[in-house]
């Protein structure tokens, strides 16, 4: 959904919590530069200081490494952080995502997340991805990587129109 405030982060975190509470090894990937899922799952550690050492490495650094020519890239599994909940892990977000997005706009980079999640998926029963409130590089990367998609939206005419536009964009 290309709109904030419809509950994407809350739904993502709550579905992940239910999954983990059922004994399933669960991962949340926070692709939203607002870092709401990260804050839900890591609590005070994540509030107001996304650059804290406890929040590194994060998904912003994962994408930034594709822009670097420094050699071997770290696998996505090295970006996973435990949470205070059993069976629930998170790859935290960072506001840096918004700053580097324009540098990632290329056809081969859009598939990087799908390839990385394919590798890490063997370690998890369920992976939930929280996306930003925009149809951008990160949202498209998540849609390409996902097996299923849940799109929350308000039931007004504007939101329905935005949903139809999103579905058309995904179809392309």
Regions inferred by a protein language model and the residue ranges of each:
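P-loop NTP-binding core
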Residues: 1-172
């Amino acid at each position: 959904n290309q709109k904030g405030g419809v509950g994407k982060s809350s739904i993502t975190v709550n579905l992940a919590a239910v999954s983990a509470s059922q004994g399933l090894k669960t991962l949340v990937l926070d692709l939203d530069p607002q870092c709401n899922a990260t804050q839900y799952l890591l609590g005070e550690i994540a509030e107001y200081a996304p650059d804290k050492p406890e929040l590194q490495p994060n998904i912003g650094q994962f994408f930034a490494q594709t822009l670097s020519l420094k050699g071997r890239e770290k696998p996505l599994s090295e970006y996973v952080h435990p949470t205070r909940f059993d069976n629930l892990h998170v790859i935290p977000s960072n506001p840096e995502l918004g700053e580097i997005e324009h540098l990632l706009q290329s056809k081969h980079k859009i598939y990087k997340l799908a390839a990385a999640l394919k590798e890490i998926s063997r370690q998890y029963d369920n992976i939930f991805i929280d996306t930003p409130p925009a149809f951008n590089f990160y949202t498209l990367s998540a849609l390409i990587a996902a097996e299923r998609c849940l799109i929350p939206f308000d039931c007004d005419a504007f939101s329905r129109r935005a949903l139809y536009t999103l579905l058309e964009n995904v179809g392309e």
